From Swiss-Prot:
Transaldolase is important for the balance of metabolites in the pentose-phosphate pathway. HAMAP family: Transaldolase_1. It is an enzyme of class 2 (transferase). GO terms for cellular component: cytoplasm. This is Transaldolase. Belongs to the transaldolase family. Type 1 subfamily. NCBIfam families: PRK12346.1, talAB. Its EC number is 2.2.1.2. Pathway: Carbohydrate degradation; pentose phosphate pathway; D-glyceraldehyde 3-phosphate and beta-D-fructose 6-phosphate from D-ribose 5-phosphate and D-xylulose 5-phosphate (non-oxidative stage): step 2/3. The gene is tal.
Amino acid sequence: MTTALDQLKQYTTVVADTGDFQQLAQYKPQDATTNPSLILKAVQKDAYKPILEKTVRDHRNESTDFIIDRLLIAFGTEILKLIPGRVSTEVDARLSFDTQRSIDKGRELIKLYEAAGVGRERILIKLASTWEGIRAAEVLQKEGIKCNMTLLFSLVQAAACAEAGAQLISPFVGRIYDWYKKQAGAEWNEARDGGANDPGVQSVRRIYTYYKTFGYKTEVMGASFRTTSQITELAGCDLLTISPDLLQKLQESNETVARKLSPETLQDKPAERVAIDEASFRFQLNDEAMATEKLAEGIRVFAADAVKLEKLIDALR
């Protein structure tokens, strides 16, 4: 019997969302994604502490920022030994509102990868989908540095990323779901409000339809899943990045997975493109409470984890 994971791979590029690269082999993903929280989680495990310790030891007299960059590259290069495709490495969330420093950091990370013998075609630089982050991606893409736009919760963010020529976007299914479920409180009914009606699933479906309708080349990679049903409802999406826990559940399941998204079967096509000059972008984002709150929260969480990682490094000096 074919597993749900194998069936999903027929329609969608499967990506592993983890810093725990020892788990990669069993799921055979094409690509992998990391973020500050996942790297922080990984370096606190016994299996990965030596990577952190060696990176600090080798660069003891350098700045903490310098060491973190080398740590990200150390994880990225190890991950790339285990997958055929690309790894996503994230720019410090504290640069989310600074276009020039985001550009500089993206260039620096690519230089470090290239110095380690990794070609830029195998790297995606992750940037927050703020106005400033999107402008940084626009510059980097023109230099041949591919960008993965993260912390994306709305169609206006997706539209702006596509217009900027971003390689890929990561709409956060689970965090959208979390927000609506919390807002509904006792009124939430999983049978009624989950599955195809899941607000996170619907958001990705709307973005996918928008991109395919207007012929954008930017890849759509659903991210931040809470359940396997959120994943299977998006079978056919360009890519889906999935945690090891959910990859395991898909591998253990023989549930039939049918294709749900396809450029040939688009429904509810938009009539016109979204206006995405800066004023329109900021107003539309502000007008969507969920997207505004989740973007702000996501930046705070990633920034806080970057600070925790700095403290771990400083304690080892």
